[in-house]
Amino acid sequence: MRQKLVIGNWKMHGSLAANAALLEGIKAGAAKATLAVCAPFPYLAQCQALLNGSQVAWGAQDVSAEARGAFTGEVSASMVGEFGCTYVLVGHSERRTYHGETDQTVAAKALRALEFGIVPVVCVGETLAQREAGETEAVVGRQLQAVLDALTVEQLSRVVLAYEPVWAIGTGKTATSEQAQAVHAFLRGQVAARDAGVAERMAILYGGSVKPDNAAELFSMTDIDGGLIGGASLKSADFLAIGNA
């Protein structure tokens, strides 16, 4: 039985004061799922200070594909690791769309995170046009395959996947539980072709307008192991409610 995992993605939101209130609220609650928050880089030290010793993990929203060097503005996995990060998001659709990240770049970032003991949360997903054209499996399959090709089975065993239909992020639209389950099952099957044991243990999260009122139905699906939560992760009550769905 896979333990549910709920990760909050704050995106480019937050302030020292607001974060403190949010994190204290999350810490004060309890959840059935494992909880984590992925904060902007400047707030990782604050997360470490406030969450260290708690049941809530923390992580970053991106990491460089490079280990070190003359890469102005980049943040390396070793730097992120110094702030106690458990997770790092790689390949979020907003990074792919706005920063031109390729499948190969995403795979390189996942590999770099693993080298420094950080769990990469590899995000895959299709646009509305791709879904309507019947290309969902081809698109997410290609995105996942780049990662499968770059990692050993042992490395793959330390990866979390997240399916985030681009058309359901921040739009208020949500994939039906059946639509989401179908893609999750497809992704697990693709991992199983590489290693069945890894596939059975791998957490595959759903991201796309998850809220307290739809989380339970989504999380009841066989291959949905939790959520990657955007807007609802900025309110402690909503985030905890999802963690208890």
Curated annotation (Swiss-Prot):
It is found in: Cytoplasm. Substrate binds at residues 9-11, 170, 209, 230-231. Its EC number is 5.3.1.1. Signal peptide: none annotated. It comes from the Bacteria. GO terms for biological process: gluconeogenesis; glyceraldehyde-3-phosphate biosynthetic process; glycerol catabolic process; glycolytic process. One of its GO terms (cellular component) is cytosol. Pathway: Carbohydrate biosynthesis; gluconeogenesis; Carbohydrate degradation; glycolysis; D-glyceraldehyde 3-phosphate from glycerone phosphate: step 1/1. It is an enzyme of class 5 (isomerase). Keywords: Cytoplasm, Gluconeogenesis, Glycolysis, Isomerase. Belongs to the triosephosphate isomerase family. HAMAP family: TIM_B (MF_00147_B). Homodimer. Involved in the gluconeogenesis. Catalyzes stereospecifically the conversion of dihydroxyacetone phosphate (DHAP) to D-glyceraldehyde-3-phosphate (G3P). This is Triosephosphate isomerase. The lineage of its organism: Bacteria, Pseudomonadati, Pseudomonadota, Betaproteobacteria, Burkholderiales.
